[in-house]
Amino acid sequence: MIGRLTGILAEKNPPQIVLDVNGVGYELDVPMSTFYNLPAAGEKTKLLTHFAVREDGHYLYGFLTEAERFAFRQLLKVSGIGARTALSVLSGLSVGDLAAAVAQQELGRLIKIPGIGKKTAERLLLELKGKLADATGVSLHPAVDDSKQDISNALLALGYNEKEAASAMKQLPADVSTSDGIRAALKLLSKV
């Protein structure tokens, strides 16, 4: 099993990347949360991986954090959830937001994710209950911190400086979701 890869980021084509490790290019599928936090092509990076062998091929999935990889593996254990759907869930919600949605049984947050219908969302809530928060150490309060960090990262990626991002972050409610927070922060920054 391949648990980690360190190398030069050769290509970035969402949701896939190619990581050049000593002349061997490993193609990995990554959630968009990982994709947007990767350095530019040509830079060195380290990814934790999940290696899957199926009858149609061998697949590598990459993650920047252990929490993301753990959540991905927990999602794969849910009946009817494959790797593509698990990546979609992690692309739509941070690990903290997912843990909070499961802990608070927020069906609506899961249904907003592309490819997740009501029945699948209900199954996710049922089968993941207690598994994400306990094993990852994610509580409801760090979920807010994850969301705020994602909002800040998005603002920095859009070209705002740290001072502008911090100023906008102070004006956001404590329990804001990532997507709502980004929208609200952009509105606040456009008024300046």
Swiss-Prot record:
Region (Flexible linker): 144-149
InterPro entries membership: DNA_helicase_Holl-junc_RuvA_I (IPR013849), Hlx-hairpin-Hlx_DNA-bd_motif (IPR003583), NA-bd_OB-fold (IPR012340), RuvA (IPR000085), RuvA_2-like (IPR010994), RuvA_C (IPR011114), RuvA_C_sf (IPR036267)
Start and end residues of each stretch annotated as Domain II: 65-143
GO cellular component: cytoplasm; Holliday junction helicase complex; Holliday junction resolvase complex
Compartmental location: Cytoplasm
Chief location category: cytoplasm
Domain of life: Bacteria
GO BP term, pick one: DNA recombination
UniProt-recorded Gene Ontology molecular function terms: ATP binding; four-way junction DNA binding; four-way junction helicase activity
Region: Domain III, residue numbers: 149-192
Region (Domain I): 1-64
Classification via CDD domains: UBA_RuvA_C (cd14332)
Gene3D superfamilies: 5' to 3' exonuclease, C-terminal subdomain, DNA helicase RuvA subunit, C-terminal domain, Nucleic acid-binding proteins
Pfam families: HHH_5, RuvA_C, RuvA_N
Record's keyword terms, sorted: Cytoplasm, DNA damage, DNA recombination, DNA repair, DNA-binding
Oligomer status and interactors: Homotetramer. Forms an RuvA(8)-RuvB(12)-Holliday junction (HJ) complex. HJ DNA is sandwiched between 2 RuvA tetramers; dsDNA enters through RuvA and exits via RuvB. An RuvB hexamer assembles on each DNA strand where it exits the tetramer. Each RuvB hexamer is contacted by two RuvA subunits (via domain III) on 2 adjacent RuvB subunits; this complex drives branch migration. In the full resolvosome a probable DNA-RuvA(4)-RuvB(12)-RuvC(2) complex forms which resolves the HJ.
Family classification: Belongs to the RuvA family.
Written domain comment of the UniProt record: Has three domains with a flexible linker between the domains II and III and assumes an 'L' shape. Domain III is highly mobile and contacts RuvB.
Protein function: The RuvA-RuvB-RuvC complex processes Holliday junction (HJ) DNA during genetic recombination and DNA repair, while the RuvA-RuvB complex plays an important role in the rescue of blocked DNA replication forks via replication fork reversal (RFR). RuvA specifically binds to HJ cruciform DNA, conferring on it an open structure. The RuvB hexamer acts as an ATP-dependent pump, pulling dsDNA into and through the RuvAB complex. HJ branch migration allows RuvC to scan DNA until it finds its consensus sequence, where it cleaves and resolves the cruciform DNA.
Protein name (Swiss-Prot/TrEMBL): Holliday junction branch migration complex subunit RuvA
Gene: ruvA
